[in-house]
């Protein structure tokens, strides 16, 4: 693949709304050829919307989007838009639409060459064939299928049959299939929405190496902080309907945000101090005026009386000036740095049976997916479960949650369990955020709204939004809110960082440090794993291969 010096992306005055909700307003930005940019922001801020605009999947309501990429565009959405009856080959063809179109045009041109009745028709067909062949070779179309196999192997899906139905694949397998096919199409411009979701360590490492060697432009939405550090030089933050650009990668973004917050705090502190000083000045001089008699007898009109009246006029002037400054400062307030939506709840621990284990497994077998001879989890123990995709991690959590009965063995979990699943709950699209949160929960509507708002995960107006209007990250917040709003003795977290913003992941980590019950964590987030303190269990092909 060759990159074009004219390849670029730009937005000029772009506004995008859904019904009456404005997601992006007057956004302008440019991305240079060969640039590797990460898009971050709060859940629902408009990250995926921005990527869809760049991919041409949606059109702006105002403004202009320009994408010049003669070498093609590869777009990876968060979900594969094909029905369960579709095949693996259908998914590959969808990701390689541009190449498949070129192949079809080549076949039509070959037919035109064979059927040309005149020299002029033959020359036209030869010219078209040469042009199409050059385009196809630039994309290395002849090696595309081999690249699919290589990418599937790198992402942990070797030998996937092309005729296999998508409905027989897990959500993670479908995501990796779509990613492999998108990369194999070898476009000049890659637009990737959460590409590291559902990838184990080996697959993420392969992806980082592949994208680092990509000679074109990469724009990716991701919550993976290590991935941002290693791949991107530019960070685009979507916030408050706008997009801001930061250099020096994710570390540079964090430093810039911290400096900006300090600057805003200093400006607010200075404004507040000046306002308070002038209010005190006005009040002090009013009190001084009150101490000077308004009327004096004739005997008082001496030298001292003129000094008193002079002080009187001076105090009045100071009061007037101070009041004017207070009015100006009040009319032009300086806002303090905004507090981001964050997880403010403390995850409560349910009362359990004293020092009894939170969970015990003995001789557990689940088909060919899981074999656990013995596992004991203390009342306040923390356990990190790792292993490649398909190792049985989610199966083990489902057994601990009581959602999956083993074929053999005994399971004892005496306390209350909270389970954050990897797969999202299929809430009806017409439910509001508040209705989804309150589903099967005691308490009236106002009480549920207060509980929801106290968690800090949604603004008040967001409680009225329909589930169908939410981003993946916002729907994940519903699950997180339901989890942390009830006390539990055993907390099971299956890929809790999926679809959450980096800032919220930090808040979740902080909330977990204050949780006093037993915790079992499955995560591909390398930074979360590096900060984890507790026991470690490794699974491979459903069998415990290591523990410490």
Curated annotation (Swiss-Prot):
Highest taxon listed in the record's lineage: Bacteria
Location(s), subcellular: Cell membrane
Domain ABC transporter: 9-265, 347-547
GO biological process: response to antibiotic
An MF annotation (GO) of this entry: ATP hydrolysis activity
InterPro entries recorded: AAA+_ATPase, ABC_transporter-like_ATP-bd, ABC_transporter-like_CS, ABCF_ATPase, P-loop_NTPase
Pfam families the UniProt entry points to: ABC_tran
Family to which the UniProt record says this protein belongs: Belongs to the ABC transporter superfamily.
NCBIfam families (alphabetical): ABCF_producer, ribo_prot_ABC_F
Protein name per its UniProtKB record: Tylosin resistance ATP-binding protein TlrC
Organism annotation: Streptomyces fradiae (Streptomyces roseoflavus)
């Amino acid at each position: 693949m060759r990159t074009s010096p004219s390849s670029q992306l730009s937005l000029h005055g772009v506004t995008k709304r859904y019904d009456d909700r404005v997601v992006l307003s007057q956004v302008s930005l440019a991305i240079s050829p060969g640039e590797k940019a990460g898009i971050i922001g709060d859940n629902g801020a408009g990250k995926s919307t921005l990527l869809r605009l760049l991919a041409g999947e949606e059109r702006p309501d105002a403004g202009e989007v320009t994408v010049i990429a003669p070498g093609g565009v590869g777009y990876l959405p968060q979900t594969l838009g094909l029905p369960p009856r579709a095949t693996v080959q259908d998914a590959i063809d969808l990701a390689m639409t541009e190449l498949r179109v070129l192949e079809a045009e080549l076949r039509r041109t070959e037919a035109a060459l064979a059927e040309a009745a005149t020299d002029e028709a033959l020359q036209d067909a030869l010219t078209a064939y040469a042009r199409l062949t050059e385009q196809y070779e630039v994309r290395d179309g002849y090696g595309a299928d081999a690249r699919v196999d290589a990418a599937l192997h790198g992402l942990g899906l070797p030998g996937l049959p092309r005729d296999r139905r998508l409905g027989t694949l897990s959500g993670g397998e479908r995501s990796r299939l779509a990613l492999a096919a998108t990369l194999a199409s070898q476009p000049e411009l890659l637009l990737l929405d959460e590409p590291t979701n559902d990838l184990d360590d080996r697959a993420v490492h392969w992806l980082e190496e592949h994208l680092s060697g990509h000679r074109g432009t990469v724009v990716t939405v991701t919550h993976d902080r290590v991935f941002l550090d290693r791949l991107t030089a530019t960070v685009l933050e979507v916030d408050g309907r706008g997009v801001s650009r930061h250099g020096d990668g994710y570390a540079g973004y964090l430093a810039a945000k911290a400096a900006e917050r300090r600057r805003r705090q200093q400006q607010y502190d200075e404004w507040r101090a000046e306002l308070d000083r002038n209010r005190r000045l006005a009040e002090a001089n009013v009190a001084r005026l009150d101490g000077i008699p308004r009327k004096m007898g004739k005997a008082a009109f001496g030298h001292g009386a003129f000094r008193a009246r002079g002080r009187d006029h001076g105090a009045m002037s100071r009061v007037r000036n101070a009041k004017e400054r207070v009015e100006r400062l009040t009319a032009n307030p300086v806002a303090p740095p905004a507090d981001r939506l964050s997880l403010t709840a403390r995850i409560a621990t349910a009362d359990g049976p004293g020092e009894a284990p939170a969970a015990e497994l003995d001789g557990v077998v689940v088909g060919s997916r899981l074999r656990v001879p013995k596992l004991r989890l203390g009342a306040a123990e923390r356990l990190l479960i790792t292993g490649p995709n398909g190792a049985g991690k989610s199966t083990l959590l489902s057994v601990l949650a009581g959602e999956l009965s083993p074929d053999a063995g005994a399971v004892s979990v005496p306390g209350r369990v909270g389970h954050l699943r990897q797969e999202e709950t299929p809430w009806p699209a017409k439910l509001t955020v508040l209705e989804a949160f309150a589903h099967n929960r005691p308490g009236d509507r106002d009480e549920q709204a207060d509980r929801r708002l106290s968690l800090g995960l949604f603004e008040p107006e967001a409680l009225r939004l329909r589930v169908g209007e939410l981003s993946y990250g916002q729907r994940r917040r519903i699950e997180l809110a339901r989890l942390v709003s009830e006390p539990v003795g055993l907390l099971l977290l299956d890929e809790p960082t999926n679809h959450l913003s980096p800032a919220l992941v930090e808040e979740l980590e902080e909330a977990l440090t204050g949780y006093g019950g037993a915790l079992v964590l499955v995560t591909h987030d390398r930074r979360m794993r590096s900060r984890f303190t507790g026991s470690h269990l490794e699974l491979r092909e459903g069998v415990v291969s290591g523990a410490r």
